[in-house]
Amino acid sequence: QGEAGIGLFLLDANSDGVARQWLPTMDQARKQAALQLRDVSVPGTDLMGEAGQAWPALSTVLDLAAVALAAEQVGGCQQLLDMTVEYTGERVQFNRTIASFQAVKHKAADMMLQTEVARSAIYYAACVAQETLEGGPLAGELAEASSVAKSYCSDAYFAVAGDSLQLFGGVGFTWEYDVHLYFKRAKSSEHMLGNGSVHRERLAATLLD
């Protein structure tokens, strides 16, 4: 970022002064690294677009990425719901499957409700994202749609993962089942590209402006 604003440059990852540092993560299935730049010089010919005019494009890319991540979160919700329904239908306690207990049914119903609402949010956000890429009439609503989807889907994914872990019980923490992997993914993806609080504040600022 310079006096003219934010600029976007092409940078060879093997350039002098560029280093990548591996970061330990809660979600072991999603690798992350910190990019360190020390005294790195980039020629003006590697500038993408006009100097200081990169933020609109970067903002759009971040919104599109948030929509994509929210879609992944909805997929995680559905998978957790499916696994939980299957497990509770097989797990027997007191000579009956635990799925037959009303409290378990209520918990599963709550999981389904949050999953379906999250699905509705991502369907709309995906539609707006497509319109943005095609220059359609909804292109101007990408920021709002992405924040709605990311905020709700983040909260729903973590809540559904927590409920699933509760219904699986202690076995959900073992490597024999994938529930704990989804729980870790839910928590890590919640904070990636902004958590629910960040996006709700952004949405409120946009709507009240």
Can you say where each PLM-predicted feature lies in the sequence?
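Internal glycine-rich alpha/beta core junctions
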Residues: 12-14, 25-61, 82, 196, ...
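Alpha-helical interface subdomain recognition
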Residues: 60-209
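A generic local secondary-structure boundary/capping motif
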Residues: 1, 22-27
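Short, glycine- and charge-enriched coil/turn segments that flank and shape catalytic ligand pockets
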Residues: 2-5, 43-53, 130-140
